[in-house]
């Protein structure tokens, strides 16, 4: 009998920010296939005999290819197991959850998706930065800081984005290029506020604030490194001004 795969969003970092439904799924799972960026504390809730499989991806470390991860999910489900695919943030926000669902559908494997709190909103929020604020920002855009190398053409052009707030995920290692693009946007200037939030919502959270004119230098000086979220726009300082 075929099992089932549940994609669970683990939230932005703090283990207490997972949903009740997500935690319940972990407790019931026969197999937990987990990413690098999830809080390892969540694995303590798995059954004693549950199989825990690490499939993390991180620059500079061994990375599992998406095809390998897909294969694990399919094989374990075909063994009749209840499989939890535990992902940082939300499975469908730059989490490649859609690709995994398509693979499961190809093999007629039942699946469920349990949303998670995305780091795109929660990380700035916990750092005191709202992504929208009345009279300051009425729109926000979330983009990836590095696009897939196999894309035929670039889809994100920061020089043309008109949202009041731009949230960039996975962009710290590409910061210099991102800033160059943003400075070509008529809506931005060297004075536009920027924040880099590293390991957001956790006890190791660090925040670097600056402007498009000095953030690259500040990031180097303060040794900015992934994982992190970059926020661009007037909202960065809006709660500091009152």
UniProtKB/Swiss-Prot annotation:
GO biological process, alphabetically ordered: cobalamin biosynthetic process; methylation; siroheme biosynthetic process
Chain sites annotated for binding S-adenosyl-L-homocysteine: 12, 88-90, 118-119, 170
Pathway: Cofactor biosynthesis; adenosylcobalamin biosynthesis; precorrin-2 from uroporphyrinogen III: step 1/1
Segments traversing the membrane: none
Record-linked InterPro entries: 4pyrrol_Mease, 4pyrrol_Methylase_sf, 4pyrrole_Mease_sub1, 4pyrrole_Mease_sub2, CobA/CysG_C, Siro_Cobalamin_biosynth, Uropor_MeTrfase_CS
GO molecular-function terms, A-Z: uroporphyrin-III C-methyltransferase activity
Keywords: Cobalamin biosynthesis, Methyltransferase, Porphyrin biosynthesis, S-adenosyl-L-methionine, Transferase
Top-rank taxon, per record: Archaea
Enzyme Commission code: 2.1.1.107
Role played: It is a step in the biosynthesis of both cobalamin (vitamin B12) and coenzyme F430.
PANTHER family: S-ADENOSYL-L-METHIONINE-DEPENDENT UROPORPHYRINOGEN III METHYLTRANSFERASE, CHLOROPLASTIC, SIROHEME SYNTHASE-RELATED
Family membership noted in the UniProt record: Belongs to the precorrin methyltransferase family.
NCBIfam families in alphabetical order: cobA_cysG_Cterm, PRK06136.1
Protein name from the UniProt record: Uroporphyrinogen-III C-methyltransferase
């Amino acid at each position: 009998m075929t099992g089932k795969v549940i994609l669970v969003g683990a939230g932005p970092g703090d283990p207490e920010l997972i949903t009740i439904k997500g935690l319940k799924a972990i407790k019931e799972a026969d197999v937990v296939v987990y990413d690098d960026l999830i809080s390892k504390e969540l694995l303590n809730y798995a059954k004693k005999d549950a199989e825990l499989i690490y499939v993390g991806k991180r620059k500079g470390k061994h990375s599992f290819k998406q095809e390998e991860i897909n294969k694990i999910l399919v094989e374990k489900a075909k063994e009749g197991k209840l499989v939890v695919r535990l992902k940082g943030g939300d499975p469908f926000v730059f989490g490649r959850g859609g690709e995994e669902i398509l693979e499961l559908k190809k093999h007629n494997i039942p699946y469920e998706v349990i949303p998670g709190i995305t780091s795109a909103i929660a990380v700035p929020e916990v750092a005191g930065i709202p992504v929208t604020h009345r009279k300051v920002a009425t729109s926000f855009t979330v983009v990836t800081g590095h696009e897939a190398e196999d894309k035929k053409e670039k889809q994100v052009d920061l020089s043309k984005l008109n949202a009041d707030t731009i949230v960039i995920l996975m962009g710290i290692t590409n910061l210099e290029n991102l800033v160059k693009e943003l400075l070509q946007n008529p809506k931005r200037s060297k004075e536009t506020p920027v924040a880099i939030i590293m390991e957001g919502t956790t006890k190791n959270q660090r925040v670097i604030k600056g402007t498009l004119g000095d953030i690259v230098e500040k990031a180097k000086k303060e040794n900015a490194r992934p994982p992190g979220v970059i926020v661009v726009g007037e909202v960065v300082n809006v709660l500091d001004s009152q």
